[in-house]
From Swiss-Prot:
Source species: Thermoanaerobacter sp. (strain X514)
Record-linked Pfam families: Ribosomal_L12 (PF00542), Ribosomal_L12_N (PF16320)
Recorded superkingdom: Bacteria
Protein name: Large ribosomal subunit protein bL12
GO MF: mRNA binding; structural constituent of ribosome
HAMAP family associated with the record: Ribosomal_bL12
Amino acid sequence: MSKEEILEAIKNMTVLELAELVKALEEEFGVSAAAPVAVAAAPAAGAPAAAPAEEKTEFDVILQEVGSDKIKVIKVVREVTGLGLKEAKDLVESAPKPVKEGVSKDEANQIKAKFEEVGAKVEIK
């Protein structure tokens, strides 16, 4: 199978199928898909010093702490991300973890409010 065929197959997958694929790849190769995100975000931390006039337009919502009602938090994760029950549960149990990335400030604040309503602690970066 060529690289182009693999990419074409991935393009035709649903979000749920992609989430399952990522999980299977993580298990198969013993890696975490979240690690590259954290590494990629680290250099950006120094960037504002170079361009202070540029305002950030994309934000990441990171689930820091679940709180006392894990089931309600899982429901909010499913609502916000569209993940299946198992994927949402895995995300909640592996907090701190990004829930939604590259969203507008308004959307990030709305998502944060939903999580805070059910007792979870979220950070917007």
